[in-house]
C-alpha cells in the first residue's frame, strides 16, 4: 500500500512512525498514573482530585469496593470505594477497567449515598463507562470472604484482615475461570443465569453454611443488567480510540498500594490484585508505551491497617499522637490504622517496581507538633545491612531499622500555600526525602481541602 493512501487500521488519524527497528509505533495520548507507595491511605484521592479537574477520562484499573478514597469539594466530603473519585468532575468520563471487580449493589449504593451529599454526582450514570471484561462480585463472594476469615481465625489463630467485600473470592473465581463478567450480564440473561447457578452451587459445596437465594439474586441482577447496560462498553477499543484520537488528558487512579500488591506486597497480608504500575496495563488493556507520568503518593509518616510486618511502627506515644492527629481510621472498615515513622527502604522498593516520575508527600502538617522526626533509612538482619526489601514476612518482622533523626519545626503549617512559606526544617525534611530517594516531590499536602496541596513545579 502506498504512503499517500495512509495506513490501514489507525483510528482517528493515529500517526505511524517508522522506528530504527523498522517497526511501526503509534504516537498518541499517554495516561497519567497515581499510585499508593506504602500500605494505602496515603491520600491518593486528593492527588487524583487535583488532576481530575483537567481530565477527560479518569480510570480505575484494579481492586473493587475494598478501596477507600475521600475527596473534599466545597466543604462536602465524598467517599468513594468503587467509583473513580474523578466522577465528581462533570466534564470527565469515569472508566472502570477490566481489572476491576464490580459489586453492583455496592456501586449503586455508593453513587446514591454521594448524591445525597452534594452536587458532585449529579448525572453520574451518563458519565460512567464500564469495561465489558470486568468481573462481577456476587453477594456469595462477600459471604464466602467472611467465612474464609472466620476459618483462618479458628485454624491459625489469625486472619488476613480483609474488608470482607468478596475481593479475594472473586479474583479466585476469575483465576479458576468460573467467574462471570459484565459482558455476560448484559448479553443473554438466560445463559448468564445458568452459569450463575452453577457458580453458586460450587460455592455452596465449598462452604455448606453459605445461604444463597439464587432466584432472588437473579431477579436483582436482571434489574441491575437493565440499568448498567448503557454504561458497558468494549474497554480495550474505547481506550484505544481515546489514546489515539484528539488530545485528551487520561488519568488512572490506583487503588490500594505498592505494599499491598499481590506479587510485591507483604504477602499474604496483601490485596488480591496488582496495584503497582503493571496492573495499569493489564487492568485497562493498554500497552506500556501509553503510560506517561507515574506519581507515587507518600504519607509524611507510615500507616498500615490490619496485621502484617511494619518495621517502623511506633507502639508508643508517638504512634498514638500520629493516630490521633492524623485521624487514622480506615475509610472502608473504620479500623484504627497502625502508625510509624517514614520508611525509606520501603519507598525505594516501591520505586524500583513503579519507576515514579514524581511524588506527592501528604499530611506533612501532622508532624507540626514534633520537636524531632525520625526516618527509617536502612534495614539490618543479624547486625548486617541488607540492600533489599525482604519478601519473607518472618525475616521482615526481624529487621532492625536504622534511623536518621531530623529536627522538627513546631509550627502550624495548615495555612501554608507555597513551599517558600514552609518552616525551614519542614523544607529540609522534604528535600531530605527527595535526595535520599532520588525522586522529585511535586506536591506537599498540609490539610484536607484541595487548596491545601502545595505544588512545587
Swiss-Prot record:
Subunit structure: Homodimer.
Positions contributing to substrate binding: 41, 331-337
Listed Gene3D superfamilies: Adenylosuccinate Synthetase, subunit A, domain 1 (3.40.440.10), Adenylosuccinate Synthetase, subunit A, domain 2 (1.10.300.10), Adenylosuccinate Synthetase, subunit A, domain 3 (3.90.170.10)
EC number of the protein: 6.3.4.4
Catalytic activity: IMP + L-aspartate + GTP = N(6)-(1,2-dicarboxyethyl)-AMP + GDP + phosphate + 2 H(+)
Single GO biological process annotation from the record: 'de novo' AMP biosynthetic process
Signal peptide: none
Residues binding GTP, per UniProt: 40-46, 68-70, 337, 363-365, 445-448
Family membership: Belongs to the adenylosuccinate synthetase family.
Function per UniProt: Plays an important role in the de novo pathway and in the salvage pathway of purine nucleotide biosynthesis. Catalyzes the first committed step in the biosynthesis of AMP from IMP.
Family matches, as SMART domains: Adenylsucc_synt
Keyword flag Metal-binding: yes
Main location: cytoplasm
Protein name, entry field: Adenylosuccinate synthetase isozyme 2 A
CDD domains per the UniProt record, alphabetical: AdSS
Binding sites annotated in the UniProt record for IMP: 41-44, 66-69, 163, 177, 256, 271, 335
InterPro entries named in the record: Adenylosuccin_syn_GTP-bd, Adenylosuccin_syn_Lys_AS, Adenylosuccinate_synth_dom1, Adenylosuccinate_synth_dom2, Adenylosuccinate_synth_dom3, Adenylosuccinate_synthetase, AdSS_2_vert, P-loop_NTPase
Activity regulation details: Inhibited competitively by AMP and IMP and non-competitively by fructose 1,6-bisphosphate.
